[in-house]
Each structure stands twice: as C-alpha cells, then as structure tokens.
C-alpha cells in the first residue's frame, strides 16, 4: 500500500503521459510545486529520481525512455531528453553546480536549506542539458551542466561528460573522450 500511495503523490508532482510508469523505486521532487515543470512522455519508465529546484528548473522526457534505478536528474534550468533515451542505473545528470562556489555563500545556502527550505532565488551557474533521441548513457556516468548529447550518442559506463558529444559517437572515460563514431549499420 505504501508504494501505491507514494506513486499517487509523485503523480501530483509531474505531468505523466498515458502509459508512462513511475516504478516503486522512482522519486519525484518538484520543489517549486509547478507540476508542468516535470513532463514525462508516453511509454517512459522511471526508476530513478527527478528533481527540480525551488527557484526553477524543468525536466522534459520524451517517449519510450528508460531512467534506471539510482539515476538522478536534477534541474535548476532545463534538462531535456529526446525519445528512446536509455539512462542506466546510478547515472547523474545536472544542469547546475548544486551549491555556490564561494565558501561563505555555500555555508549560507546550506544553512538556509536547513532552516527554511530551498531558496527560491539562487544562482547556481545553471546551463541547460540536451540529450538527443536514441542516446544511451552507461551505468554510473555523470553528465554535467551545459552538455548536449547528439542523436544516438553512447556514453560508456563510469564516464564524466563535461563537453558536448556529436551524434552517433561513443565516448568514455574521466573526462570522457571520443572512442569512435558509429557506422551507418549501427545507427
């Protein structure tokens, strides 16, 4: 019964298309309370965590996507996933720094979260993230702010992606580097 109640509560935090599924391990946090800020497309399965910050952010997920268990997508500006995107377990995607860089500002930010909740006016160096159709992000990879993954891009497991990736390209490593381009028969 608890899982059912939790899924009902999460549905009130987002727009969930017909036949999209929030699994028992899914978590949805819409800090601003703006339901359309998290939009999940048809036939998408979410097992991970979706979070928009109190001062803004939006997450748009296309159709037939999969977000694995332990994956985290945190937005303070904009994270968009195309159609048929596969996000493996324990992937992290962020369009922001999560905390200010200056130590004093970081301390003030943390104190405010503890005392009054997440602030609604904060500069976290936000830069949008775009993930193209048919992209695949391997287990435990991290996609940082400002990155675009082209159509069909593949990110190897455990990669740290700090720069945009061209369509139909495989990258891997820390930091991620081009491994090879996919051939026409692999597209």
Name the predicted role of every residue range.
Residues 160:
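Conserved sequence/active-site signature of Rossmann-fold short-chain dehydrogenase/reductase
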Residues 147:
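Extracellular carbohydrate recognition
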């Amino acid at each position: 019964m608890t899982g059912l109640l939790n899924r009902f509560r999460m549905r009130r935090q987002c727009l969930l298309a017909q036949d999209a599924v929030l699994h028992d391990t899914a978590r949805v946090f819409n800090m601003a309370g703006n339901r359309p800020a998290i939009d999940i497309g048809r036939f998408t399965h979410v097992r991970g965590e979706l979070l928009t910050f109190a001062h803004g952010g939006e997450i748009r997920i296309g159709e037939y996507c999969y977000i694995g268990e332990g994956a985290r997508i945190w937005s303070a500006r904009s994270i968009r996933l195309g159609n048929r995107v596969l996000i493996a377990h324990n992937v992290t995607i962020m369009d922001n720094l999560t905390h200010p860089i200056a130590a004093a500002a970081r301390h003030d930010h943390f104190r405010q979260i503890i005392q009054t909740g997440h602030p609604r006016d904060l500069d976290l160096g936000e830069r949008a993230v775009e993930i193209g159709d048919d992209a695949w992000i391997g287990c435990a990879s991290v996609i940082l702010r400002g990155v675009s993954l082209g159509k069909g891009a593949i990110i190897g497991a455990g990669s740290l992606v700090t720069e945009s990736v061209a369509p139909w390209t495989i990258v891997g490593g820390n930091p991620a580097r081009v491994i090879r381009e996919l051939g026409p028969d692999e597209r």
